[in-house]
Amino acid sequence: MRTWMAATPLLAVAVIAAPLTAQGAAAPAGEPTLDEVRTLTMRYQSVDTALADGYIRDPGDVCETAEMMGRPADVGTMGIHFFRPDLLGISGPPNPRIDGTGTHTDFRKPAVLIYEPQADGSLQLVAVENLVFLKSWESAGHTAPPTFLGNAYNRMVDDPATKVDEAHHFAPHYDLHVWVHKENPAGVFAQFNPSGTCSHHKPKAHAH
């Protein structure tokens, strides 16, 4: 995720019989299945609906690729990120990095939506994402990364010894992508999608 992003804690829900995920494994109590996440976020195939619900397009209007992060080009792309500042706990500009108080992990209402530019100029919803800031997560008493359906979030911290910003201009954080709207050969929880493309991206003239 990249750009400006009060945290809504994930409420534990007592479940007697855990539902099945798309892969057929039982979802942990209180967590939605992949099918449920897909169904609940299908409405955001309309960018106008996403904007009306408080999602904001990345002010930098960047379509992110693996190559930008110092990875081989064939690793794939992410896309253009739209985010909810309230769910990420972001209340101001970078200083010097984008930082917030967010610890929101409920994929029923993801903090980030990811779109892939299409040849006709439209945007296709491909994935959803949650991002939590490391400092806030640990301050809440957590000693391990958040997880979703048994998959640990990725720990993102910049390494000043490299030219690439591994944390994408963000303060240290955890994030997890879930590709429920586009098949991903690398896996539903991979950061990048080898079948994705940013070739049709036309940055907005006003973006900076």
Located regions from the model:
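Positively charged n-region of N-terminal signal peptides that target proteins for export
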Residues: 1-4
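Bacterial N-terminal signal peptides
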Residues: 7-19
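Primary mode marks residue(s) on the alpha4-beta5-alpha5 output face of response regulator receiver
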Residues: 23-208
